[in-house]
Amino acid sequence: MYQTTAALRSAFLEYFRTNGHQVVDSSSLVPANDPTLLFTNAGMNQFKDVFLGADKRSYSRATSSQRCVRAGGKHNDLDNVGYTARHHTFFEMLGNFSFGDYFKEEAIHFAWTFLTEELKLPKERLCVTIYDTDDEAFEIWNKKIGVAAENIIRIGDNKGAAYASDNFWQMGDTGPCGPCSEIFYDHGDHIWGGRPGTPEEDGDRFIEIWNIVFMQYNRQADGEMKPLPKPSVDTGMGIERIAAIMQGVHSNYEIDIFQALIKKAAAILGVTDLENKSLRVIADHIRSCAFLIADGVMPSNEGRGYVLRRIIRRAVRHGNKLGATESFFYKLVPTLIEVMGADAAKGLQETQAIVEKSLKAEEEQFARTLERGLGILDAALNELATNVLDGETAFKLYDTYGFPVDLTADVCRERDITVDEAGFEVAMAAQRSRAQAAGQFETDYNEGLIIDEQSGFTGYTDLNNQATVTAIFKAGESVDSIVAGDDVVIVLDNTPFYGESGGQCGDEGVLIADGIEFTVTDTQKYGQAIGHIGRVATGTVKVGQVVTANVDKKLRHRTELNHSVTHLLHAALRQVLGTHVSQKGSLVDPERLRFDFSHFEGVKAHELKEVEELVNTQIRRNHELTAEVMDIETAKEKGAMALFGEKYDSEVRVVTMGDFSIELCGGTHVGRTGDIGLFKITSEGGIAAGIRRIEAVTGAAAMAYVAKQQAQLEEAAALLKGDSASVVAKLKAQLDKTKLLEKELSQLKDKLAAATSADLAGEAVDVNGVKVLVKKLEGVDAGALRGLQDELKQKLQSGIVVLAIAGEDKVNMIVGVTKDLTGKVKAGELVASIAVQVGGKGGGRPDMAQAGGSQPENLDAALEQVIPWISAKLA
């Protein structure tokens, strides 16, 4: 019964569907519009706004099987993955949810019935925990369900603070939270461990399988617990844990999904020991990596992309440990798709090619430095006098060889060695400061402003209408009236102003009434409300006041041009580059558009030209734009593209442009594509690994851009004494002439260096029997230094050469050591000792090294130290 994980997933969802729950698809691993989360890490993440009362759904009961990742931030299981039976970077969370519908009694009943009647788990194998003061939950378990009192365990605040308990659940430092009740399964007395709340609770005998959270509060940044609008329920059951029970095994790695991946990895790598922990690591990591890429995350050096990179590189290192000599990780994707089941792997199957290509590219990139880095780490570990690796070495491995510190710690752990993480953090301080400045993950949620009011939007057809002020917020607090000079957010019962979303900026304009003018500088969405952000210019505005809302027509029109063309651009990119292209972000305002999309290489010039021409062709065809509302399943059947990071309701708005483009979109658009006039790409480049960005202009702005380009072309033609038609030919001739002159100049420099070296060689001094030349040069180009030191070494035959040039604000230097002396004096060490005195750094080979510096005023003093330094080495 339910012997596969896929069958178990289906049974769970069907059970709750028959009990009145809406089956909701798993959301993306990248939380939509939630800067407080790195990754989706619980089933309730996609319902956060519902619990907060900021989002309304057509259903009050839901169930889902949510893909989750815990490998960064507060919820980080990466270090333990592969070494324990139940830690994973990726897992599926089965859950049922009540949004102000049922509460404790029904939630407990649903869970108990599913486990004991549907799955037929023996009741004597189950025990439950509750929050210490939750007497209501105790009564339900004991009196209504019939669980004996001794099998109901109260857990208090056991983590050193109020509400800090295993039985008080919270998603993060802020957000929905509440007491919870957990159901545990007893794997039997042949496994060590004790019941929850005992000293032996960390053993593997009693395993939590279901957590039922009674969502009652919204935790604020200051720790205050504010009651949620309606008590709700959030539950979670890890599918891997319940699958292990149903399949009669103890470790999650023994269930069907992991066994298939482990066996495939073993076959690829030629490994026969299926119990090898490295195989577990690889089997776990392919799940998180593949699904993260499928959800739009690409390997990079910051944010989510860096977490993905860390996981991939950890898997590759374990493959290397098992003897991998070529790329292997990406080859597991087909097996993963097969074993996950059609429903769970649908998104992965659609992006299989891009996932495999991205994994292979990252693996090949890391392979170029992996062996060398491991060699350096191995040498450092062999030389250790203690069981702690210094932070400086860990940082060097990170900075030079791309080793995430947890990968270094992973290698060290296998030899019972720890990493000096404090030392590593000191070395990383500069990089961390830059990352923090980027401010990727903020702690505020919706800027703390939760508005209960709802606003109707009339802006698809009207740019002005009368409306009633339903709420005013000043400095985050609700107020009844405001006066001239006040900066506030005004909410209307209906409005033509578009609230920023989907990449389209919020409208600007004015709200007016007798003696009143309110300047709107931005418009934002707050749940179901549309907030008009701005300042009172004149008069007093009160809640209940009737005003006329006027959108700035010119700004709106220019924004619509840019928004509509992003749809054409998206379709054109997919047609020219391939269907793997998907939108990763956009910015649309009155001045320009910015469009981010997935692609594995720079867009070639001819491809960019083809995209631009294709978009302009669709503009000239003057397609009519149509917008219609339909249920999301119908929209998908029509081929409408959904955009990365966006949340959609059960009913969606579909915007169609002829037979060329169809997308889900709530934004505003032109009436016909011909209204756009002209589309001109101004730049294309990479912003992260696998993510490209196009910036462009439309309409009058595009015409102005073309006119400016034409003016610059004519100016260039005049400088070249020709016309615009001859610019390329004349410029090519000029470049050829310049190249020839540069060659002649280089030859003259070489002759000068040879002549100079003959004079300089005679200035060498004897230091302990070795000829040493230390010289600060005047009037010599930095590019001639290398050739000059080569000439001098040849003339000296055996000796050391130190040459330096001082500019206004910089120093260039080179050190040459003849081969017979490198055993005693190394050029890299010598140049580094000089460079540090002039505010620089450098390095190179034992026989030749270069350096630069930013303190020319210290050069003379630094050069005076060279001969004593060499003398000490030779002694």
From Swiss-Prot:
GO terms for biological process: alanyl-tRNA aminoacylation; negative regulation of DNA-templated transcription. CDD domains: AlaRS_core. It comes from the Bacteria. It catalyses: tRNA(Ala) + L-alanine + ATP = L-alanyl-tRNA(Ala) + AMP + diphosphate. Catalyzes the attachment of alanine to tRNA(Ala) in a two-step reaction: alanine is first activated by ATP to form Ala-AMP and then transferred to the acceptor end of tRNA(Ala). Also edits incorrectly charged Ser-tRNA(Ala) and Gly-tRNA(Ala) via its editing domain. Keywords: Aminoacyl-tRNA synthetase, ATP-binding, Cytoplasm, Ligase, Metal-binding, Nucleotide-binding, Protein biosynthesis, RNA-binding, tRNA-binding, Zinc. Consists of three domains; the N-terminal catalytic domain, the editing domain and the C-terminal C-Ala domain. The editing domain removes incorrectly charged amino acids, while the C-Ala domain, along with tRNA(Ala), serves as a bridge to cooperatively bring together the editing and aminoacylation centers thus stimulating deacylation of misacylated tRNAs. Belongs to the class-II aminoacyl-tRNA synthetase family. PANTHER family: ALANINE--TRNA LIGASE, CYTOPLASMIC, ALANYL-TRNA SYNTHETASE. This is Alanine--tRNA ligase. It is found in: Cytoplasm. It comes from Shewanella pealeana (strain ATCC 700345 / ANG-SQ1). Binds 1 zinc ion per subunit.
